Amino acid sequence: MNTPEDSTLGREVAYPSGYDPSLLFPIPRAAGREAIGLTGALPFTGRDRWHAYELSWLDAHGKPCVATATLHVPHDSPALIESKSLKLYLNSLNATRFNSAEAVRTRIVTDLSTRAGADVSVEFGLPPIDGVGDGESIDALDVSIDDYGPPNAAYLTAQAQPVVEEVLTSALLKSNCPVTGQPDWASVTLHYRGAPIEREGLLRYLVSFRDHAEFHEQCVERIFHDVLLRCAPEWLVVEARYTRRGGLDINPLRSSLSVPAPLSVFRDLRQ
């Protein structure tokens, strides 16, 4: 079984000179989910949306082509794709000739689906940047914080008040790569219906990820799991928009609804 320590993270590697799908490094989701307490049927649906900013190949005549792309990896794929390996794989296309852009897209779909163990979708282009986004930010709350990890779900409570439907956001989520220790920065959105979540506690909880080491996808699943257990909303959608590294950013979304609530699809200003 592949582990994060087996990947190219934190290692000096040569950039590929030709197309090489073996560069893609899948990491089973099961171990990360077991650490959270997700051992049975998953309480969510969702996807990991990747934005690729550095995609290039050669056309049939050898002329370079450039593009951006949006990739969707389903939440129930047996494996996630380690980000540095995806960067190296996409770079392996740089000197490869294709007859059409569609041939490139099809090749990426096939390779990613094989490694993830589920159908991955790929489309050219990126969502628009939105400087406002959905919801109400909790970042201006006047709170004292001195707990930066590990994540502390005890901060999460729901108020004994009538049910609301609201979207709460924070740009203060930070976690760290579990292999290299590099910081991962994100804006996070919670859309839910239920008793009002106590906002100061939610902010303290999100900040308690600051020294925590876990992959992006696992952080979002941990947030979803903790909020669902501690606050018991009728339904919940959690999405994080991580900042770019190596020409890629990751945007995991988890929802308790079979069809996720209509959060807008956009890129954050920091992306």
From Swiss-Prot:
The subcellular localization recorded is: Cytoplasm
Which GO molecular function annotations are given, in alphabetical order? Answer: preQ1 synthase activity
- In which domain of life is the source organism classified? Bacteria
- Protein's pathway: tRNA modification; tRNA-queuosine biosynthesis
> What reaction(s) does this enzyme catalyze?
7-aminomethyl-7-carbaguanine + 2 NADP(+) = 7-cyano-7-deazaguanine + 2 NADPH + 3 H(+)
Q: How does it assemble?
A: Homodimer.
Q: Under which EC number(s) is this enzyme classified?
A: 1.7.1.13
Say which family it is in. Answer: Belongs to the GTP cyclohydrolase I family. QueF type 2 subfamily.
Sequence positions that bind substrate: I81, E82, S83, H216, E217
Tell me, in a sentence or two, what this protein's role is.
Catalyzes the NADPH-dependent reduction of 7-cyano-7-deazaguanine (preQ0) to 7-aminomethyl-7-deazaguanine (preQ1).
Record: residues binding NADPH: S83, K84, R245, G246
Q: Which terms under GO biological process does the entry name?
A: queuosine biosynthetic process; tRNA modification
Main location per the UniProt record: cytoplasm
Q: Which named protein is this?
A: NADPH-dependent 7-cyano-7-deazaguanine reductase
Coding gene? queF
